[in-house]
Amino acid sequence: MKQFKVVPTIQEFETCKDFADTYGIGKGDLVFVSNGTKNHLFPELDNSGAIVVNYRNYGSGEPTDLIVEGICKDLEGKTYNRVFSIGGGTILDVAKLFALKTVSPVVKLFNKELEIVKDKELILVPTTCGTGSEVTNISILELTAINSKFGLAVDELYPDKAILIPELLAGLPMKYFATSSIDALIHSIESFTSPKGNDFTRMFSLNAMDMILKGYQEIAKNGEEARKPILRQFMLASTYAGIAFGNAGCAAVHAMSYPLGAKYHVPHGEANYAIFTEVYKTYMKLQPVGIINKLNNHLAGILGCGEDEVYTEIEKLLNHIIPKKALHEYGMTQEDIADFTETVMTKQTRLMNNNYTELTAETVTEIYKSLF
């Protein structure tokens, strides 16, 4: 059986003020937002009566179980009915957990050893153009005990509202624009080739690919500032890709990037890009006939090349956005290859089940070696 659903109501606002006026955030609300975003765009939060959490007070980089436990401790005894999160994917993923009745112990929650009950309204507002988290039922944390990222995917994590405000992308530095939008591109591609994909998910995948790659071509031709007039295009593409992978899932690219990102603190989109094309070249060697042919045909049309050249040409285009690095440039060692492979094969089965074709441990090892 194939299925497709979009749970959150998606709303778009012209400005942050329009959003704030509509929702009237105040007493009884929990708001996750960085100091920079709050001070610049939502200064009224300081005197609103809402509980305001600056995620960065609890740690830097990608979210961990320890960060969530720290926030839980500080929220003990405080009550709230609505959870707002205004930020990138890390902040959105953390905030989702606080719409649940019980969050701690976090490791038990992620292992599904706790009863999972949602008892608060959840409103997510992305400030980047990559996560897609605003429309998915997935929260990703680094679990420090296994030194890798791990996902919890349950319907209780679906937001009630996904709020799109293109104004929020205006101040996003090129570096963060690059890593987040590449993540969205890979969401669209992995969901397209997933066995769980269907005509509905692939419609969203293809639209996201078109919008992102054509935007990249504009940037490659005219420079970084060319992104400014098309920021709404990238925000929509990110949400389209989120709808696609929220239904069809991501796969080996994400699974293989997680240990790299967790151990060496590589930004999520950049870690995905480091792995991406080699996985798809491997798919083509193992199973050259299938849905991947439709993907290659579509990409060839956008890139203006032959189907046998798409992964070379897409890499050339992406290198205008963020240069690709070898894995050792992030600090990865030869010894990590075996450890990362074991983590992928034993801890990331949720993702590996969505591969276009089966990848064995030996194949995963070879991909890491070729990228080292």
Each model region followed by its residue ranges:
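ATP/NTP phosphate-donor binding region
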Residues: 1-82, 327
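Short glycine-/acidic-enriched loop or helix-start segments at secondary-structure transitions
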Residues: 41-43, 94-96, 134-135, 173
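DPxDG-like acidic metal-binding loop motif
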Residues: 93-104
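A glycine/threonine-rich phosphate-anchoring loop and its flanking beta-alpha core
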Residues: 103-199, 290-294
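C-terminal charged capping/lid subdomain of soluble metabolic enzymes
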Residues: 156, 298-372
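Active-site segments that bind and position negatively charged phosphate/pyrophosphate groups
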Residues: 191-316
